From Swiss-Prot:
This protein's name: Thiamine-phosphate synthase
Species this protein is from: Agrobacterium fabrum (strain C58 / ATCC 33970) (Agrobacterium tumefaciens (strain C58))
Gene it is expressed from: thiE
Residues at which Mg(2+) binds: 71, 90
Catalytic activity: 2-[(2R,5Z)-2-carboxy-4-methylthiazol-5(2H)-ylidene]ethyl phosphate + 4-amino-2-methyl-5-(diphosphooxymethyl)pyrimidine + 2 H(+) = thiamine phosphate + CO2 + diphosphate; 2-(2-carboxy-4-methylthiazol-5-yl)ethyl phosphate + 4-amino-2-methyl-5-(diphosphooxymethyl)pyrimidine + 2 H(+) = thiamine phosphate + CO2 + diphosphate; 4-methyl-5-(2-phosphooxyethyl)-thiazole + 4-amino-2-methyl-5-(diphosphooxymethyl)pyrimidine + H(+) = thiamine phosphate + diphosphate
Function per UniProt: Condenses 4-methyl-5-(beta-hydroxyethyl)thiazole monophosphate (THZ-P) and 2-methyl-4-amino-5-hydroxymethyl pyrimidine pyrophosphate (HMP-PP) to form thiamine monophosphate (TMP).
């Protein structure tokens, strides 16, 4: 398992192109506290995704912040990204590991018990549970799991993979960070609350500070 700092996953979605060029958004987050970046595009062509991923990777070069690609192992491989984030309907993590290699970061989405059980046997480096709350960033057919559901799924993951970082995603704003971290999250994934904020740099920094404070408060 590769060591992944999952405290703040800034998720750069293609729909944010109306805010600013995606590489600019990624760099702003990388310079102000994001510990991992995820590029997501549910509708773009493969060529567009590879070009965008390469541009983001170039923009954040030298920051030390890794870039993972949502869903697409082929795009991760072609763009030279640091890894991939996979959902239940995507390529399985074992196959992705064979293609991308041992040093690649592989993350998994966990929405329910079946996903958690699947993750237990997969060569993944982190898992992200969600959606935890309602979100405006994505049409989600699944009901939010809430804090209680998050706690249950996290416990299953930690039982089987005690060293795996577990994050939370969906509807997480600054006010919800303390509760999510207190419930056991090792970090959070954020889209709108960072990238549609009036000041992206400040929003990223504020999230990072809130996460670090909540993690410190959780220590025994």
């Amino acid at each position: 398992m590769n060591k992944v700092d999952y405290r703040l996953n800034a998720l750069v979605d293609a729909s944010l192109a109306d805010v600013a060029p995606l590489p600019e958004l990624a760099l702003a987050a990388a310079l102000n506290g994001a510990t991992i970046l995820q590029y997501r595009d549910k509708h773009g062509s493969t060529r567009e995704m590879i070009e965008n991923a390469r541009a983001i990777r170039e923009a954040i070069g030298g920051t030390g912040v890794p870039l993972v690609i949502n869903d697409r192992v082929d795009v991760a491989l072609a763009s030279g990204a640091d890894g991939v984030h996979l959902g239940a309907d995507d390529m399985d993590a074992k196959t992705a590991r064979r293609i991308l290699g041992e040093k690649a970061i592989i993350g998994l989405t966990v929405k329910n018990r079946a996903d958690a059980e699947r993750a237990a046997s997969m060569p993944a480096d982190y898992a992200c549970i969600g959606g935890v709350f309602e979100t405006v960033s994505k049409v989600n057919p699944d009901k939010p799991v809430g804090i209680e559901g998050f706690t249950t799924l996290r416990a299953l993951l930690k039982e089987w993979q005690p060293d795996m970082p577990v994050g939370a995603i969906a509807g997480i704003d600054l006010d919800r960070v303390p509760a999510v971290i207190a419930a056991g999250a090792d970090g959070v994934a954020v889209i709108s609350a960072i990238f549609r904020a009036a000041n992206i740099a400040s929003a990223t920094s504020d999230f990072r500070s809130a996460i670090d404070a909540a993690l410190k408060a959780r220590q025994p």
